[in-house]
Amino acid sequence: MKIPIDIHTHNVPSHPDEAIVNCSPELFVPEKDAWYSVGIHPWSIAESYYGTAVEHALWKKLVEQVRNPQVLAIGEAGIDKLINVPIVIQEDFFKEQARLASDVNKPLIIHAVKATDELLRLKKEINPSASWIIHGFRGKAALATEYLRHGFYLSFGE
């Protein structure tokens, strides 16, 4: 297996073995020779289906999909304080995906917007066995140092 050099894109590139395509459970249809991360992005969380059969079906689908050998990571999971979804709901979705990542021993790709304190607390609370990767890090050196000190990995770019 070639090691992908781009851990986060939304479209299968011309050289699919060089990137990990991020998709939601509803859109995951693996193509030959492509690599994926599958997860529930905070922007995709609908408060209206929280705790319903729709949410249960989504989780069931995600749990099945992450066992596919073409899925190399879970995510993009995360916490985004700039969206209109209560933090408690975002944290519930995040925790479930973090636990799933540890269960299947695959890294968790994280979307983080103004959520450093929450992520540091959740990492301590969950104590994951899987790697946590902050996707598209654009913060200052002090923030990078803080994340690295707590065992996070950082990816750069969009």
Regions found by a protein language model. Give the residues of each.
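Mid-domain alpha/beta scaffold segments of enzyme catalytic cores
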Residues: M1-E158
